[in-house]
Amino acid sequence: MKPWAAFHLIFLVASSLEGEVSNYGTRGAQDTEPTCRTEHQCTRDKIILQSQPGIPGIPGVPGTNGSEGLKGDPGPQGPPGIRGPDGIRGEAGPKGDKGDQGDKGDKGDKGDKGEDCNLDDCLPTEVRNCQDLLERGETLNGWYKIYPTEEVSMLVFCDMSTDGGGWLVFQRRQDGSVNFYREWESYKKGFGRQGSEFWLGNDKIHLLTNSGTQQLRIDLADFENIHTFATYSSFSIGNETEKYKLTLGSHLDGNMGDSLTLQNGRSFSTKDRDNDVSHIHCAVNFKGAWWYRKCHESNLNGLYHKGKHATYANGINWLTGKGYHYSYKYADMKIRPQKSETTVS
């Protein structure tokens, strides 16, 4: 046994130690029986000797890792953090689709009954034309409602500044924004835009020109802004059955000559109604709608060319003005009731 090894020696000592120690060596194995007779005696006679603990041994090799344990339950939710600063505002998103039309609203309550009156008293039948409006104090150019008859009202453009005012404009060309190469039905009802170009409508022109004698004035302006005009003592057209036949009085005055008298007595023609007396279809050949004969000396409903054009007589032409190869920038045709004395300018 190495000197640093731990050991225990237990000696059983008899209750009487005298002489026993010396005799121990002479006895045999059979003489080693203890002299104590009771467990108590033997126990209290034991002597236990213990040395100091030895040096710890070298650590063993680590064992292998055990298997991964089960996932624990989630911990409780923590308190909300402090709100951060607002971010930069993003760009506006694309416009959404148009929503469905809403439900129709409830019908309103019935209004109070108006006062009874005769038709002659209720309608301002004295406002039959632009001249009547001028005499009532209306001095601005613009659109007004008039009553050519007690049963009929219409919205018309009044020129209150040219040659004393009171002119009702039924045709205007100024920028080419409206197509004038149209069918019969369009010219019958009228077309165009209030703010630019329009034709009032042959049915309305017939009604207006058959309620008293109407003078006619035509104003033109070229692309150099040189203004010219022509006036006629009277102007009227027939109804649709008469194919809106033109009846024109004498040429009165102006600085662009007379290029309308040739059309006097002729029916109106459009690209789908050939009422001229030519072997060709004048409205189709000259891209307009007019009182064509064989075919024209004027074509104020022709194509909107910008000044000089190579094509023949299919623009806004006035023969005694700038001829068949020049299309005017501006043109209008207007009427007002005939006066006993007329001053033109």
Swiss-Prot record:
The keyword Signal applies. It holds the Pfam family Collagen. Initiates complement activation and/or interferes in platelet aggregation and/or blood coagulation. InterPro entries: Collagen, Fibrinogen-like_C, Fibrinogen_a/b/g_C_1, Fibrinogen_a/b/g_C_dom, Fibrinogen_C-term_domain, Fibrinogen_CS. Keywords: Complement system impairing toxin, Disulfide bond, Hemostasis impairing toxin, Hydroxylation, Secreted, Signal, Toxin. It comes from the Eukaryota. SUPFAM superfamilies: Fibrinogen C-terminal domain-like (SSF56496). Expressed by the venom duct. Its main location: secreted. This is Ryncolin-4. The keyword Disulfide bond applies. Hydroxylated, possibly at Pro-80. Belongs to the ficolin lectin family. Veficolin subfamily. Disulfide bonds join 130-158, 282-295. Residues 86-116 have a biased composition (Basic and acidic residues). It is found in: Secreted. One of its GO terms (biological process) is complement activation, lectin pathway. Residues 1-19 form the signal peptide.
